[in-house]
A protein has these predicted regions:
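ATP-binding N-terminal substructure of ATP-dependent carboxylate-amine bond-forming enzymes
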Residues: 1-171, 175
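Short acidic, glycine/serine/threonine-rich loops at helix termini
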Residues: 44, 84, 152-155, 228-235, ...
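Short, flexible loop/turn elements at secondary-structure junctions
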Residues: 144-145, 223-225, 287-290, 301-305, ...
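Active-site nucleotide/adenylate-binding loops and adjacent lid/helix of ATP-dependent enzymes
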Residues: 166-282, 332-344
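Short acidic-glycine loop/turn motifs at beta-strand connectors
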Residues: 234-238, 303-308, 369-373
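A long amphipathic alpha-helix within ATP-dependent nucleotide-binding catalytic cores
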Residues: 269-293, 311, 323-378, 417-452
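Glycine-rich phosphate/pyrophosphate-binding beta-alpha loops
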Residues: 319-320, 383-397
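Peripheral (often C-terminal) accessory segments that flank ATP-dependent C-N-forming ligase machineries
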Residues: 405-524
Length: 524
């Protein structure tokens, strides 16, 4: 019954859909459930993960439409000053008018459970949400869609603007590889999904035999998040088991012994914990792409409920961790030498996902390796994984779109304001230093105001901050720096870092290195 009711609700959404822009201009109630409904043992590896519910606060900018009403639910109450900060960004809308159309609700539950589960466990809260929404004028958005979000959609009788959870597999590591193959998009050699360490070693040995030149293999939990579920298997220490020097059985045994020495991308991970997740989540192995000059671009797309593919953006991602596997931030747009190729591949992948029945946002991560060529610079692009959900590049781009009311130009891969001005940005979720710990949201607002670090609505340039709730405990902050040129965006980011360092230098006798580069990766 639940599945048929959910499909009926999604069909209603398809019937009412015209376009992304016109949909937001209608008289609508938007329910925002920013739940990271991911494996909680994996998400716990991310510092301040509970505050990632703030990443969808860009949705408040939708209140610029005077007919829109919005309900935003969080696990713990949001500081009022954070809400005020976003509402003050609205161009041409009186603050009080927007605030009257915003309803904030909370579960008052800081446990590791996902926010959606917390809501479902509180039937009175569910009923209050239901009463606040207007029938036939409402829809629900979320960070990622699972069976919990589907259940909440059905209980509220509100359509969910997200893929059916039955399609979740296509956003996993193994599912991504199958979509790449269907789309004829280049991707690294790798394995099918395995469920135990013995089969993992077997798959790694077979991959090594197919590619004897490999120096490293990536081991990925099938449902890892932001690269936190990735590990590196170094092959050099077991050189005696190389394909041309040993039997297959010898190679498998050598890899099995070496698995205990995987290099994990997060300091919290151990082989004992990682190996225990393989029977629960599954895992794959994949060839590690080497290269002297290597980048990590991505493309973001949107599948309308009618199945049309829209390319939203491209980015050059900034990755960290021992082997560059952890997402830290991004530049918009991606390098001009490959951004149009990213778009073409993104459309192919979007079409394959739409054929499976997926709707709403998807992102595709790539690895780009510079190739020597007599005619100039060329880049080899290999697709790595699909995110069938909102991701780290969603909120900065949507913030840019909502604040400037501009448009993405598919012919160039650039973003233009209504006045024809090109816009660029640098964004991160991981500006994190120990000396920032103890800063309260109010303190940050004082610093923003005093040093004029705010977003200027007249020039449509400046900084937009998020993850403010993670500052006090974790010293962690997110921001999007919008400029009229790549250099201006980079300068804005560097200015914020310089000011925060100076403002907090008296709080601590030392400053640790930020996990995000102190100077973003240079634009080409």
């Amino acid at each position: 019954m639940g599945n048929s009711k959910f499909r009926q609700l999604q069909n209603n959404l398809r019937d009412r859909w015209l376009s992304v822009d016109s949909f937001d201009q209608d008289d609508r109630d938007i329910l925002v459930v920013p739940s990271l409904t991911l494996d909680q043992r994996e998400i716990k590896k991310v510092d301040g993960f509970l505050h990632y519910e703030e990443r969808l606060l860009f949705s408040l900018i939708r209140l610029r439409n005077p007919h829109t009403r919005l309900i935003y639910i969080t696990a713990q109450p949001l500081p009022p000053i954070v809400i005020d900060y976003y509402l003050q960004l609205l161009p041409g809308i009186p603050f009080s008018h927007a605030r009257d159309r915003l309803l904030l609700m909370t579960t008052y539950d800081g446990s590791l459970k996902s926010l959606t589960q917390k809501i479902l466990e509180r039937p009175r809260l569910v009923e209050r949400i239901r009463r606040a929404l207007r029938p036939d004028k409402s829809y629900m958005v979320c960070y990622n869609s699972t069976y919990l979000e589907r259940e909440l959609s059905v209980q509220l009788d509100v359509p969910l603007l997200a893929p059916d959870p039955d399609l979740l597999y296509w956003g996993t590591k193994s599912g991504s590889r199958q979509i790449f193959q269907l789309s004829d998009v280049p991707h690294p050699d790798g394995s099918e999904l395995v469920w135990n360490c013995e089969d993992l070693a077997e798959a790694a040995a077979q991959l090594w035999e197919r590619q004897p030149q490999l120096r490293r293999i990536v081991v990925k939990l099938n449902e890892g998040f932001s690269g936190e579920g990735n590990a590196i298997l170094e092959l050099n220490p077991i050189a005696q088991a190389k394909p041309e020097q040993a039997s297959h059985a010898t190679r498998v045994r050598a890899i099995q012994q070496r698995l205990e020495h995987l290099r994990f991308q997060t300091t919290y991970e151990t082989w004992k914990n990682f190996s225990s997740r393989i029977p629960e989540l599954g895992a794959i192995v994949e060839a590690f792409i080497e290269g002297e000059e290597k980048r990590s671009p991505s493309v973001q797309g949107y599948i309308t409920p009618q199945g049309k593919i829209n390319i939203l953006s491209t980015h050059d991602q900034i990755l960290g961790g021992p082997d560059g596997q952890i997402y830290l931030g991004c530049h918009f747009p991606a390098d001009e030498t490959y951004r149009l190729t990213l778009q073409e591949m993104g459309i192919k992948i979007g079409q394959a996902l739409a054929a499976k029945g997926a709707i709403e946002r998807y992102g595709v991560d790539f690895v780009a390796v510079r190739q020597p060529h007599s005619s100039g610079v060329t880049w080899d692009l290999q697709a790595i994984e699909i995110n069938l959900r909102k991701g780290g590049t969603t909120h900065p781009f949507m913030t840019l779109k909502f604040l400037t009311n501009g448009r993405y130009d598919l012919s160039t891969g650039l973003f233009h304001t209504q006045q024809g001005k090109d816009k660029y940005y640098v964004a991160t979720d991981n500006l994190q230093k120990d000396c920032y710990r103890g800063l309260m949201p109010n303190d940050l607002m004082d610093i923003i105001a005093y040093h004029k670090l705010h977003f200027d609505s007249s020039t449509r340039t400046g900084n937009i901050f998020h993850l403010m709730g993670a500052l006090s405990e974790f010293g962690k902050l997110g921001l999007t720096c919008i400029g009229n040129s790549p250099q201006q965006a980079e300068n804005l980011y560097n200015q914020v870092v310089k000011v925060l360092d100076a403002e907090t230098s008296t709080q601590s006798n030392y400053t640790t290195e930020s996990s995000y580069p102190s100077t973003p990766i240079a634009w080409s």
